[in-house]
Every structure is written in structure tokens, then in C-alpha cells.
A protein has these predicted regions:
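Short hydrophobic "helix-edge" motifs at membrane interfaces and signal-peptide entry regions
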Residues: 10, 54-55, 296-297
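Nucleotidyltransferase catalytic core that binds NTPs
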Residues: 27-268, 276-280, 308
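Phosphate/ribose-recognition catalytic cores of enzymes acting on nucleotide-derived substrates
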Residues: 257-317
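Serine residues within intrinsically disordered or low-complexity segments
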Residues: 8-9, 27
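Ala/Thr-enriched low-complexity intrinsically disordered regions
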Residues: 14-16, 24-25, 29
Length: 317
């Protein structure tokens, strides 16, 4: 992978500005690019001995502004920021997009440099899943069986396994995740509590394109026509919020309205629309408390997810 890292200062600035805008000013600090677990642990041990707090942002790379918002939050709240770039094979099912998932290490390094990341961790698959590997971490029960778990039954086992491994290696004070992957964040929070990880899970707001489409590395798969229709997912969620603000409290009614809206989008095929408790992910017939309205929709072979969280008081709005 070394050839991807031999980029000039000008290349780093150009790549960063394409994502961040012209106000991006990549620093010339010594961001460490680490591949080995041994070197990572060495860097973490040094930071701990110096009394530094550690913020961690786990990603699969091909970074976008959503990822960068997590890095900025981590930079603001911690002395040392670690970002991992690893396309985790165990969270992909058969016939999913593991091989096609976008990768660009040079571009990612430019963006991390611009955000003053201290350590960029690029482990090899063989380092994290060596021959003979047989151990997995799994949150059991309805939380991982609903929503994305219905159509991706092994997905969250792969997510919790790799995140647990990374937590053990990085030992962060805080780990940062995006609200777009709301179910993932809830599952990881459950795992962290159950396994007594001494850290805080920080969930940051969804970052959207100008037309409302939630930022995702998979957006690059969309054809021009699909990209034109994809913002209707967010429009359907905004409509659902407006329904709640006007007093609607029926989960099925909100779900049907969203499905009707999305079915009007050319090429959209609904995987699920769900109205659930934001913490337990249990389906709600009547809205109360913290509510998550989530959806997954396919445009061709591209599967997009989005959600909105609403704090519904017992009294009518």
C-alpha cells in the first residue's frame, strides 16, 4: 500500500478541498500511518503514559464529510485522535458489495491530514482475521434481528466483532459514530455496556448533501437518475416529522405514509420502513418517548439507509 501514501502537499490540499471546500487547510503535522497492531499499541501506550485522552473514529474508508464531522468532534474533545480505515469482510454477506466497496487510501490520508488526525490505522485483513480465527462477538436478541438485521442476518455480528477488537487495541476514552447508522450505534452501545468497555459512545448528527441526501460512501454507486430520486428518502422522513408535529401518534399510519411517498420515487424498492423505540428498537404502535423512524431503500443494487429521531412527549404537540 505504500505507493498510495507518497502524495505531495499539493495533492493533499487538492483532495481535501474537493471534500471540505476551499477553507480546508491540511496541516503538515506528523500524522502517523500505522499498519501493524504492535505499532498501534506502542503509540497508544505512549499517549497513555503522557496522560492524553484518546478519541477514536472507526471507518471503512472512502471518507466523506460525515466522517470528517466525527473527526472534528473527536479533535475538539480529545488530546489524541485515532482513525481506523478497514473494510471489514465479516460484516458483508454473500452477494454484497465487499469487492466493489470504494477504496482510496491516498484520498483518505489527505482528508485525515487536513483534520489533524494523529494516528491513521490501516490494518490488513490478515492481521485482524488470521488463519484459524474463530472468535466472534454478537449482541443477541431483537435488537440485531430487526431493521437491517432482517435482510442482513450476519451483518451486526461482523460489526460488533471488529469494533470490539478495535476498542481493545485503541482503548479510547470516546468512540464516535454517525446517527445515519442508528441501529449500528444502538447495537455498539449495548455491546459496550454488556462487555464493560470503559469508554463513552458519542453519536453525532447525520451530515447531508445540499438536497438532503444522507452522506454515504455508497452514494457513488448511484446513476444520475437514481441520484436525482434518492433525496425523496429524506423528504419522506421530513414528512413524518411534520405528521408527528401535527399530532399523529400512530406508528402504522406514519409507516404507510412514508411507504406511499417512497413508492412514488422512480426506481425505489423498499427494504423496510420502521417506527421504533430509539434505544431498544422495539416496534411502536403508538409513538411515545424517543422514537426512531428508519428506512432502507434500494435503487438498483445500491442500498441506502436513513432515519430521523423524534422526542415525542405524551401530550399532543
Amino acid at each position: 500500500m505504500q505507493r498510495y501514501w507518497q502524495n505531495s502537499s499539493r495533492q493533499r490540499r487538492t483532495a481535501a478541498r474537493q471534500i471540505c471546500g476551499n477553507d480546508a487547510t491540511p496541516s503538515e503535522t506528523n500524522m502517523q500511518i500505522i499498519q501493524s497492531k504492535k505499532e498501534l499499541r506502542k503509540g497508544i501506550k505512549k499517549a497513555r503514559s503522557d496522560g492524553k485522552t484518546i478519541g477514536f473514529v472507526p471507518t471503512m474508508g472512502f471518507l466523506h464529510r460525515g466522517h470528517l464531522s466525527l473527526m472534528r468532534r473527536a479533535r475538539k474533545e480529545n488530546d489524541l485522535v485515532v482513525v481506523s480505515i478497514f473494510v471489514n469482510p465479516t460484516q458483508f454477506g454473500p452477494n454484497e458489495d465487499l469487492d466493489a466497496y470504494p477504496r482510496d487510501a491516498q484520498r483518505d490520508i489527505a482528508l485525515m491530514t487536513a483534520e489533524s488526525v494523529d494516528i491513521a490505522f490501516f490494518p490488513a485483513v490478515e492481521a485482524l482475521y488470521p488463519e484459524g480465527y474463530t472468535t466472534f462477538v454478537e449482541v443477541e436478541g431483537p435488537m440485531t434481528e430487526v431493521l437491517c438485521g432482517q435482510s442482513r442476518p450476519t451483518h451486526f455480528r461482523g460489526v460488533t466483532t471488529i469494533v470490539a477488537k478495535l476498542f481493545n487495541m485503541v482503548a479510547p476514552d470516546r468512540a464516535y459514530f454517525g446517527q445515519k447508522d442508528a441501529q449500528q450505534a444502538a447495537v455498539i452501545r449495548r455491546m459496550a455496556v454488556d462487555l464493560d468497555f470503559d469508554l463513552s459512545i458519542v453519536v453525532c448528527p447525520i451530515v447531508r448533501e445540499a438536497d438532503g441526501l444522507a452522506m454515504s460512501s455508497r452514494n457513488t454507486y448511484l446513476s444520475p437518475e437514481q441520484r436525482e430520486n434518492a433525496p425523496q428518502l429524506n423528504q419522506a422522513l421530513i414528512m413524518s416529522r411534520e405528521m408527528v408535529e401535527k399530532g399523529e401518534r400512530s406508528g402504522p399510519a406514519i409507516r404507510k405514509a412514508i411507504e406511499s411517498k417512497i413508492n412514488g420515487a422512480k426506481g425505489a424498492v423498499i427494504d423496510y420502513v420502521a417506527v421504533v423505540n430509539a434505544e431498544t428498537l422495539a416496534e411502536l404502535q403508538t409513538l411515545e418517548g424517543k422514537v426512531l423512524i428508519a428506512l432502507a431503500v434500494k435503487f438498483g443494487t445500491t442500498r441506502l439507509i436513513d432515519n430521523i429521531q423524534i422526542d415525542v412527549r405524551h401530550q399532543l404537540a
